[in-house]
Amino acid sequence: MPPPQSPGWQEPAVSWLLDHCPSDYRGYPGWRKNPVALAWVAVRHIDAQLEAMRAAYREVRVDLGDLVSPQALGQIQSDLETEGLRLRASARAARLVFEALQGKRYIPRL
């Protein structure tokens, strides 16, 4: 994605945000016409996914411990952890896009 405030940066930002939402969101014209609204809902969607992964990680041993092998359980926990990390990064990035669409500038900390 090009840096915010560069010419045409919002179009790739909209595509990126839609990639992080359910595919049905591509059918709603309001999201494309109002990128800040898309970013707003994308942040909420990603946050909900992250909370679901956290809950699954907390509950997987109790809910699946008797249904899958110990090796499978370990792999499932690892997969949930990996997905949680991916979602954390996506949530941070979506928040930065949301802020950029509001005209806020990112200032890295030293």
What spans do the regions from the language model cover?
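Eukaryotic low-complexity, intrinsically disordered regulatory segments enriched in serine, proline
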Residues: 6-110
